[in-house]
Regions:
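Soluble C-terminal extramembrane regulatory/interaction domains of multi-pass membrane proteins
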Residues: 66-388
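Transmembrane helix-loop junctions at the membrane interface of multipass transporters and ion channels
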Residues: 4-7, 16-51, 55-71
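Residues that scaffold, gate, or flank divalent-cation-dependent active/transport sites
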Residues: 1
């Protein structure tokens, strides 16, 4: 990517070509110095070209050092990505696709497919380059910047998507050949992506999910939490735009992360990542409630109850996990209070309340088999529900 950036920087190209041409000019003077008819050429090279090259040598070195800084490279990739996304939603591109839909249009279908593939390939490449920088960079701040830029790119894309012509979402070879989609061997999976128009978001979620697992393995809690926080920000934007397929993809991604977080918490007795994820997942569900996504809220409450039951079983060997159940209960309680303020149907509120009450009571477990710590923990949540 550095080579690509360098080849598109006009200042670097101008200076390098000036050096090359000046050097060629000097060599020509040296070879033909005896037969040189115009001695002014030697004066021009020695007293003008050479001083200019020397004068700008050090500033150019510092310019290149600054230009190749990780933060600057991230910013360039991000801005170029935004530029392409905004071009997709521009009037010119919409008019181009609309003209191509006409039967008597001079724009051929092959040309449309080629342009679509080029745009899709560039968007995929930008995401892959940002993902590579996560591995390349050893400092936390640049990696955090990559995660934020990736999240903001998705949010801008989601806002622009209603203005993008549907023909753009056709799955081309650029998407099929991308590493994130090569595991989709069934045509049905790709056709669903095309129908839901979420190939770009799914690609981003997979990269963020991989980064999240990597941060879990490295015990980098702050960066892992940032991944989930940025997913929540994307979810709020998707809820505002009423993008249901994207919201379902987000729920799937959060559930995948929950699996990894629970696995890490039970294996290494480390519940911090699980706590952070539960907090951000609950914020996402709250944003769904704010936009009256009843079915999705019900689905998320079901998942929370399922995870609570699973954590409750793991807590027999690790008592610190009881705190996570209390966190899940408290977060769902806050969501239920918000739902009550928005005057949802009383039956729906009752269903959600039942999910909370079953959060730490698996159907296959008898209360007589529970120890005192489990019963005490259960009583605390009963008090929380009563206060709610």
């Amino acid at each position: 990517k550095l080579i690509d950036l360098y080849m598109h920087d006009w200042r670097s190209l101008f200076y390098i070509w000036f050096l090359v041409l000046s050097s060629i000019h000097a060599v020509v003077i040296m070879i033909f110095t005896q037969d040189l008819i115009r001695p002014g050429s030697s004066v021009l090279n020695i007293y003008l070209f050479l001083p200019v090259c020397i004068l700008f040598a050090m500033p150019y070195i510092f310019y290149i050092l600054r230009y190749t800084k990780t933060n600057h490279v991230i910013d360039i990739i991000y801005k170029n990505n935004l530029k392409y996304i905004q071009r997709l939603g521009s009037r010119k591109m919409r008019a181009f696709f609309e003209i191509s839909d006409l039967k008597d249009s001079k724009v051929s279908a092959k040309r449309i497919d080629k342009i679509t593939e080029e745009f899709q390939r560039y968007l995929m490449e930008c995401l892959n380059q940002l993902d590579n920088l996560l591995d390349y960079t050893g400092f936390k701040e640049p990696r955090a910047e990559v995660i934020r830029k990736m999240s903001h790119s998705i949010q801008v894309y989601v806002k622009e998507k209603p203005h993008i012509n549907p023909n753009f979402f056709k799955i081309t070879q650029a998407v099929r050949s991308d590493i994130s989609f090569r595991t989709m061997v069934e045509e049905k999976q790709l056709s669903e992506l095309e129908q839901d128009r979420i190939f770009f978001e799914v690609k981003s979620f997979r990269l963020l999910g991989n980064a999240y697992v990597l941060f879990l393995d490295r015990n980098e809690f702050d960066l892992a939490s940032l991944c989930t926080a940025e997913l929540t920000a994307v979810g709020k934007t998707a809820a505002e735009c009423n993008d249901n397929p994207l919201l379902k993809a987000l729920i799937f991604q959060f559930n995948t992360m929950m699996r990894f977080a629970i696995k890490q918490a039970t294996r290494f007795n480390e519940a911090r990542n699980l706590y952070n994820l539960a907090f951000h997942y609950a914020n996402f569900v709250n944003s769904l409630a704010n936009h009256h996504q009843i079915d999705l809220v019900k689905e998320c409450f079901h998942y929370f109850r399922m995870y609570g039951n699973e954590i409750f079983n793991h807590a027999k060997q690790n008592y610190s996990l009881y705190f996570i159940i209390a966190v899940l209960t408290a977060e769902l309680k806050n969501i239920l209070i918000n739902i009550h303020k928005k005057s949802w149907d009383i039956e729906i509120q009752g269903e959600l309340l039942d999910q909370i009450l079953e959060l730490d009571t698996p159907p296959d477990m008898d209360r007589d088999e529970m120890d005192d710590s489990q019963l005490t923990n259960d009583g605390v949540r009963d008090i929380q529900i009563s206060l709610a």
